[in-house]
Amino acid sequence: MSLFDFFKKKKSAQKAKDRLSVAIALDRDSNIYPHLDQMKQEIMEVVKKYSQIKDVNITKDKVGDQDILDIEIVLEEGR
């Protein structure tokens, strides 16, 4: 085994560790907000009662130790 192979293994191990960290973070988010898709659907239904909408986008961000839920509602033109 050459010196380059030794470092290559660490590189792939680091990539695997990073992928696992991302997978765990996504799993934690789904556990924190398990009903996010249902909430999006209900928000669309309520807004549709009063106006015509194209789309609703819901994103979750984290700033420091605070979770931010951002809701963007795209309305149809002419209303």
Swiss-Prot record:
<dbReference type="GO" id="GO:0032955">
    <property type="term" value="P:regulation of division septum assembly"/>
</dbReference>
<protein>
    <recommendedName>
        <fullName>Cell division topological specificity factor</fullName>
    </recommendedName>
</protein>
<keyword id="KW-0131">Cell cycle</keyword>
<comment type="similarity">
    <text>Belongs to the MinE family.</text>
</comment>
<dbReference type="InterPro" id="IPR036707">
    <property type="entry name" value="MinE_sf"/>
</dbReference>
<dbReference type="GO" id="GO:0051301">
    <property type="term" value="P:cell division"/>
</dbReference>
<dbReference type="InterPro" id="IPR005527">
    <property type="entry name" value="MinE"/>
</dbReference>
<keyword id="KW-0132">Cell division</keyword>
<comment type="function">
    <text>Prevents the cell division inhibition by proteins MinC and MinD at internal division sites while permitting inhibition at polar sites. This ensures cell division at the proper site by restricting the formation of a division septum at the midpoint of the long axis of the cell.</text>
</comment>
<dbReference type="Pfam" id="PF03776">
    <property type="entry name" value="MinE"/>
</dbReference>
